């Protein structure tokens, strides 16, 4: 199923809306429902969607209950599959191609007034170098018609780029906007090893949609989901430029940094394309980042004790804090679970371990468990000298 197939419940907004703060202001004023803006002043002929990927909407879109999603993602991690390759003539993303690349002509939004400018926050980057492929999320500041500046946190893509630059090489990439939600989930997962996230997406496609994941090859050799709404391709150059400020997942403003410049050589899109214009710091952002962390935390904790469930908390912005439910069998299971959970998601700042009778999605029940069962001097550990998340508002 394509991205657009999951927008049936969206409210269509026909009134003229500016991509400069307009979509953000309208969504905020209406409590962030699922919206499709079809009359964007600066980019006629292009639509934009926001607020699709809340936990409940995402699970409904891919046909599983919220209680099943952790085990479904964990299954895909253990059972990767291979996508199939289709010719560009069969790929919906190739229905239209710009004569010359003009990213300013598509609805990349400037949501928050504090942001540096227009940002693509929901697009995934697929990169290939030295036989390794990586798919991951990285926000991109729209610098001009054919350049963006990409924020690369210290994970696999930055390592790939650093290796390439040491050899004097650029990195071939594609930027994919609005593939189906299964691809987005796989792209949001992170692993210690260089696992091909598209193989995880392919496994999820087969399990949830009963069909293979279709990819098509671009001019630079990078393979991308064939049904995506937008695809643009080029290379991570040897140059850096200013990136930020940017309102991040915590609602705090991230710093200005020197980050890599991407230069684009081609842009294609579907007929009547719909840009995924995620609003940073809101529920969709937190869901997309937080949901894929839960199975990695559960997997890590399950190696030291019996882990039942994991919940990334709303107060922790879906990223910095979690509640983990275990079935305690040994006196030190709780402490071991804390250490394992923090190792399973290294950006996490706080984790709370509770017994199997607690509803971990209910903050009142979690607080009750703490005040009735937690002894701070015995049941608390603090890990010193660890690296903070770059999204930690304190740093």
Which positions does each model-derived feature cover?
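Conserved mixed alpha/beta core segments that line enzyme active sites in large multi-domain catalysts
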Residues: 6-28, 73-261, 267, 295-300
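Conserved small/polar residues in nucleotide/adenosyl-binding loops
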Residues: 385-392
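An N-terminal JmjN-like helical accessory module and its immediate linker preceding a catalytic domain
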Residues: 1-55, 367
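Substrate-recognition/cap regions that form aromatic- and gly/pro-loop-enriched pockets
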Residues: 314-381
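Low-complexity, highly charged intrinsically disordered N-terminal segments
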Residues: 46-84
């Amino acid at each position: 199923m394509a991205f657009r197939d999951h927008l049936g419940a969206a409210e269509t907004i026909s009134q003229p809306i500016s991509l400069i703060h307009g979509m953000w202001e309208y969504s905020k004023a209406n409590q962030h429902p699922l919206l499709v803006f079809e009359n964007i002043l600066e980019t006629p002929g292009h639509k934009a969607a926001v607020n699709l990927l809340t936990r409940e909407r995402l699970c409904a879109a891919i046909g599983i209950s919220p209680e099943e999603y952790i085990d479904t993602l964990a299954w895909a991690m253990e059972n990767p599959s291979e996508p199939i390759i289709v010719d560009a003539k069969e790929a919906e993303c190739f229905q239209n191609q710009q004569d010359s690349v003009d990213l300013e002509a598509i609805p990349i939004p400037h949501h928050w007034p504090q942001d540096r400018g227009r940002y693509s926050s929901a697009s995934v980057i697929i990169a290939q170098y030295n036989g390794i492929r990586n798919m991951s999320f990285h926000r991109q500041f729209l610098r001009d018609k054919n350049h963006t500046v990409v924020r690369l946190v210290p994970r696999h893509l930055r390592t790939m780029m650093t290796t390439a630059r040491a050899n004097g090489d650029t990195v071939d990439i594609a930027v994919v906007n609005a593939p189906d939600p299964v691809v987005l989930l796989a792209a949001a997962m992170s692993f210690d090893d260089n696992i091909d996230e598209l193989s995880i997406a392919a496994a999820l496609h087969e399990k949830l949609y009963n069909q293979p994941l279709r990819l098509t090859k671009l001019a630079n050799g990078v393979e991308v989901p064939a049904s995506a709404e937008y695809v643009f391709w080029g290379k991570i150059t040897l140059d850096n430029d200013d990136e930020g400020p940017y309102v991040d997942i915590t609602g705090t403003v991230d710093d200005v940094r020197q980050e890599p410049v991407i230069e684009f050589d081609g842009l294609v899109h579907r007929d009547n394309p719909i840009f995924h214009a995620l609003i940073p710091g809101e529920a969709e952002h937190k869901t997309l980042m937080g949901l894929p962390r839960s199975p990695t935390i559960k997997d890590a904790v399950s190696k030291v004790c019996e882990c039942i469930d994991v919940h990334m908390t709303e107060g922790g912005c879906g990223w910095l804090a979690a509640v983990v439910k275990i079935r305690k069998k040994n006196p030190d299971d709780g402490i071991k679970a804390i250490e394992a959970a923090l190792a399973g998601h290294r950006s996490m700042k706080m984790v709370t371990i509770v017994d199997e009778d607690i509803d971990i999605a209910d903050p009142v029940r979690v607080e009750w468990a703490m005040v009735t069962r937690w002894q701070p001097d015995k049941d608390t550990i603090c890990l010193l000298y660890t690296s903070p998340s770059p999204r930690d508002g304190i740093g």
